[in-house]
Amino acid sequence: NQGARYLSWFLTPATVCLAIPLYKQLHLLKKHGAAVAVSITSGVATSAVSIFLMCRVLGLSHTHYVTLLPKSITTAIGMGVSEEAGGIVTLTVISIIITGVLGNMVGETVLKLAKIDHPVAKGLAFGTSAHAVGTAKALGLGEVEGAMSSLSIAVAGLLTVIAVPIASKFI
């Protein structure tokens, strides 16, 4: 696919651009390492549990459950996770896009209401819950927020890839 090749070509420099703020804030990652690990892990777990509960309450099928599980990770990873778990990839993509856009739109307000004002916490929240679209918002808030959001995209994606085969057995 010619169009996908062009898109892939642009992803490499975009990924490097996300790594630069993280590299500049490496000292914060070292300082807050445990909090970072707990935050991202609990964010991924909370997402999985909330999807599980929503599927139970709404009477949704196993297919819908595994379709929605990767909603908070990037589209490229989420599509593969959904397909491998037996989900409906098109619906997964839609749920990922909606999650990112909503996170971008209301994330800052939610953080203010929750009285979360630490830049590291803000970045982790945006990246873990709203992936690349949330990271765009986090970068707009500051370099620390953007760096932590970039990190959490990668780690949340990895944890989700590991967790989905386990979580998919529950419904």
Regions found by a protein language model. Give the residues of each.
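Alpha-helical membrane segments and immediately flanking helix-loop junctions
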Residues: 64-91, 97-98, 113, 117-155
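Transmembrane helix-loop junctions in multi-pass membrane proteins
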Residues: 1, 21-29, 57, 86, ...
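Helix-coil boundary and interhelical linker segments in multi-pass alpha-helical membrane proteins
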Residues: 52-64, 83-91, 168-171
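Helical membrane-embedded segments and adjacent short helical loop/helix-boundary regions
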Residues: 1-20, 28, 32-35, 39, ...
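Alpha-helical transmembrane segments with an aromatic anchor "belt"
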Residues: 32-41, 57-68
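C-terminal ends of transmembrane helices
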Residues: 18-31, 107-115, 134-141
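Transmembrane alpha-helical segments of multi-pass membrane transport proteins and ion-pumping complexes
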Residues: 13-21, 40, 44-56, 75-79, ...
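Hydrophobic alpha-helical transmembrane segments of multi-pass membrane proteins
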Residues: 7-10, 37-45, 93-98, 121, ...
